Amino acid sequence: MKGDKPEEPGPGPEPSGPPPPTEEEEALLEFHRSYRELFEFFCNNTTIHGAIRLVCSQHNRMKTVFWAVLWLCTFGMMYWQFGQLFGEYFSYPVSLNINLNSDKLVFPAVSICTLNPYRYKEIQEELEELDRITEQTLFDLYKYNSSKTLVAHARSRRDLREPLPHPLQRLPVPAPPHAARGVRRAGSSMRDNNPQVNRKDWKIGFQLCNQNKSDCFYQTYSSGVDAVREWYRFHYINILSRRRQDTSPSLEEDVLGKFIFTCRFNQDSCNEANYSHFHHPMYGNCYTFNDKNSSNLWMSSMPGVNNGLSLTLRTEQNDFIPLLSTVTGARVMVHERDEPAFMDDAGFNLRPGVETSISMSKEAVDRLGGDYGDCTKNGSEVPVENLYNTKYTQQVCIHSCFQESMIKECGCAYIFYPRPDGVEFCDYRKHNSWGYCYYKLQDAFSSDRLGCFTKCRKPCSVTIYKLSASYSQWPSATSQDWVFQMLSRQNNYTIKNKRDGVAKLNIFFKELNYKSNSESPSVTMVTLLSNLGSQWSLWFGSSVLSVVEMAELIIDLLVITFLMLLRRFRSRYWSPGRGGKGTQEVASTPAASLPSSFCPHPAFFSSSPPDPAISPALSAPPPAYATLGPHPAPSGLAEASTSAHAPGEP
């Protein structure tokens, strides 16, 4: 009560410490004692559907087996679907996205060539010998008399030097048996579809040999026209190679007005800042409008024929090389501003006396590289040097690859492609076997044995201009007189053959809408995880935490297996009584390892009599189990034991 003095604690036993933890209390880290216990715990507590049925039906073996089989089949189906999803992801599929855009468009570059290789007056002396031998060859093979041509006039001027190497020849082909003749023509690799003179069974060609003349072959053609043109072209390249290495300014420069009478873009006249000049070995003088070096960037803000490039061209052929160029007109190509013009690959010809209107539509393609596609962004990883020093394109790479092979195998550069510094163009006066090497290399290139088409990958970003052309006669019969009169007075030039002397070209956008095609990954990591989660929920109706439970089960299985193996290993190899089949296990335990409660009290060994209140059974240590078994005693102890027995006792 209040006011009472607190009771003083009397003498008594001292308070003991906190009780030691019992086995039932949960430890910080513990594991199940058996697989069965672990499995029952997992099935009773997991959130995966169907697992608890394996425990609830344990008293009905048939249901247990049914649910176990169903659970395993469901598990297998789910992981089969997982394999399908991972296979789809690692195949790196792409989706094509098509967008339609509308904006002002940058006008592309337009390259146009005369279709007229270097004129007679520029390289007349170099071509006389070639023309004479070609004339004689045509007469021998086809009885063609060109006495009225310019070549005949040149031949009467002076005697020429030694004959050219690699003469053109007529080569007979052995006739097959009559029964197999139809089969040969049907399945032969020869160019039997080409026209043949008098239907003779021969071929036209010229012989090419290697450096030491140990290997030779004939470059042959079933068409005489093709053979003559190719043979003339081969020698023309040699002549041109000598001039290209020592080019005079008069040969490289040409007046724009000699080829292009009028030029307008968006109704404004062109000037010298809008074009650049280059030479093509076969197409002569070429001009590129609106290339990357132009000072003014041409833009199209309106579609239609009046909002593009309009050119009036001179297409007369009075000074053409007839044995090299068999067509008249002009050649045009549309390409990107920072790409070179490959007139052989993508150009097309314009017809004289015709107005050609070309409408364009732009299309941009953006591909995915890396694992999603075999394309390159800038060609830096392509093992081919860009000899054009321009933007990477597949054609740039392919031509550079062939030129590298040409320099490596033949020791000289092909005149149609750029050459590295310090390398000469091929000329049989310096490289007498380059023709043999070139045609062999060309055959390997066509069949991709050089690997150029494999090395040169597509660019990831490409701009394509789709062209559609329409044609009409120009000028008309009623207007041609005043048109030709104006052109002649304006350009101080007399057009001899009016209809075949001019051509008109219009290039424009037919619409400002352009299509962009871009690739994107069809299956991203987010999509993959979503699909995996959907499959997991479909087959087990669980979530990510259920996956963690499965991982925990696997870890527990591994730990329990490890502990069981460790226990078995210790019992087999670390047991102290291992030598006596386990009978010496307790007997061999040292006294120091026994608990203190099993050790005798120190007073037990004192000289004073023992306290009768203390039971000997409680104070004595437990006997060693090994001593309970029979084994011989020491001799001294045996005698003492015998003397202690009373007489007559057993």
From Swiss-Prot:
Localisation? Apical cell membrane; Cell projection, Cilium; Cytoplasmic granule; Cytoplasm
Region Disordered: start-end pairs: 1-25, 165-194, 614-650
Tissue specificity here reads: Expressed in kidney and lung (at protein level).
Membrane topology per the entry is:
Multi-pass membrane protein
Site residues by UniProt (Cleavage by Furin): R158, D159, R184, R185
Q: Which UniProt keywords apply?
A: Cell membrane, Cell projection, Cilium, Cytoplasm, Cytoplasmic vesicle, Disulfide bond, Flagellum, Glycoprotein, Ion channel, Ion transport, Membrane, Sodium, Sodium channel, Sodium transport, Transmembrane, Transmembrane helix, Transport, Ubl conjugation
Q: Topology: which residues are Cytoplasmic?
A: 1-65, 565-650
| Database matches in PROSITE patterns | ASC
Q: Name one Pfam family in it.
A: ASC
Post-translation changes: Ubiquitinated. Can be ubiquitinated at multiple sites and undergo monoubiquitination and polyubiquitination. Ubiquitination by NEDD4 or NEDD4L inhibits the ENaC channel through endocytosis, intracellular retention and degradation of its individual subunits. N-glycosylated.
Which cysteine-cysteine pairs are annotated as disulfide bonds in the entry? C113-C286, C209-C216, C263-C270, C375-C460, C397-C437, C397-C456, C401-C452, C410-C437, C410-C460, C412-C426
What's an example Gene Ontology biological process for this entry?
cellular response to acidic pH
* Any one Gene Ontology cellular component term annotated for this protein: sperm principal piece
- State the Gene Ontology terms under molecular function: ligand-gated sodium channel activity; WW domain binding
How would you summarize its activity regulation? Originally identified and characterized by its inhibition by the diuretic drug amiloride.
Q: Where is the signal peptide?
A: none
Domain of life of the source: Eukaryota
> Which ranges are annotated Pro residues under compositional bias?
9-21, 614-624
Motif PY motif is found at 621-625
Q: Region Gating release of inhibition by proteolysis (GRIP): start and end of each range?
A: 155-223
- NCBIfam families linked to this entry: ENaC (TIGR00859)
Known partners and oligomeric status? Heterotrimer; containing an alpha/SCNN1A, a beta/SCNN1B and a gamma/SCNN1G subunit. Interacts with WWP1 (via WW domains). Interacts with WWP2 (via WW domains); inhibits the channel. Interacts with BPIFA1; the interaction is indirect via SCNN1B and inhibits the proteolytic processing of SCNN1A and SCNN1G and the activation of ENaC. Interacts with the full-length immature form of PCSK9 (pro-PCSK9).
Q: Which PANTHER family match?
A: AMILORIDE-SENSITIVE SODIUM CHANNEL SUBUNIT ALPHA, AMILORIDE-SENSITIVE SODIUM CHANNEL-RELATED
| Family according to the record | Belongs to the amiloride-sensitive sodium channel (TC 1.A.6) family. SCNN1A subfamily.
Q: What does this protein do?
A: This is one of the three pore-forming subunits of the heterotrimeric epithelial sodium channel (ENaC), a critical regulator of sodium balance and fluid homeostasis. ENaC operates in epithelial tissues, where it mediates the electrodiffusion of sodium ions from extracellular fluid through the apical membrane of cells, with water following osmotically. It plays a key role in maintaining sodium homeostasis through electrogenic sodium reabsorption in the kidneys. Additionally, ENaC is essential for airway surface liquid homeostasis, which is crucial for proper mucus clearance.
Q: What is this protein called?
A: Epithelial sodium channel subunit alpha
List the top taxonomic levels of the source.
Answer: Eukaryota, Metazoa, Chordata, Craniata, Vertebrata
Gene name of this polypeptide? SCNN1A
